[in-house]
């Protein structure tokens, strides 16, 4: 467990002339070098998409947010806490846009304790509202990785075997105050097939390195706010499923939203199953909702697993929006601009091609700029040229 892979220590490595990477242009500016670094980062994201790999598309993710006194540091503006909560709002929106049949929950750890900010839910508005309110939260004390992971594990270990169980920790402190041996907990997490990833805001911490390595997660330390946002974006796409995860057909129900009229004499207010379990401040008795087609249990939101009969309840658009993960769009062919003989305008945005390289779809042979290339692969998930070409071929 405690043995780290052999690698050369920083002071044992060869002398690196890192400043030679930076090159001035004719005007003495470093802008060209910086743009080249950003360009390579954008292209790397496109190629990092997993191809024909079995993915854990039904995800259950707990985000653990450090609420210790270190979150008041102002190296991120206006401070670490506010910056983190704003980026998490964006992350939640992207997460549900890319993973509509998944759920997320938020845990805050401070003063050696852990408490749930939100329960596992598929409703992004609920999480974003809680994150907005958490801006006024007081940061004090030390975080507890042990208590946070234990709280997340108590819920995740009961999730079905065909779903992915994940924890993402936003860790600002350099210490953790734990009531027991965290290395024993790491073994338990590994046995329960819970994948833990960490994003550090200060520096690398050994226990986080071991935690991520043993559970199959990732561990990165941010450089600045832009890098922070990119690291969060890496956790939007579903991870590859482990070889030991269950693979079977899943029964699903597709309930329609029913709204009863106040003038309907047979309409009877009823509680949602979610309100019965949680201490929610929202009104519990409502006339409408989603009713399980198998046992008629009522729910206010989808997706959800029925607490009575265990049936997974989703809507058809949820499945349709998850389809692109199974068949990701192939990366476009990269060609130097001076070697490209076609039109010098991007097919996507119709802007003039000014970058050093252009990107050509291998199917329809249309050309794109780097920004449209990234947008097509990250958001559209289909080539506009190929989509417009299909009706022409069929004679429509």
Swiss-Prot record:
Source superkingdom: Eukaryota
Pfam families for the chain: C1_4, Ssl1
VWFA domain mapped to chain residues: 60-236
ZnF (C4-type) residues: 292-309
Keyword rRNA-binding: no
GO cellular component: core TFIIH complex portion of holo TFIIH complex; nucleus; transcription factor TFIID complex; transcription factor TFIIH core complex; transcription factor TFIIH holo complex
Protein name: General transcription factor IIH subunit 2
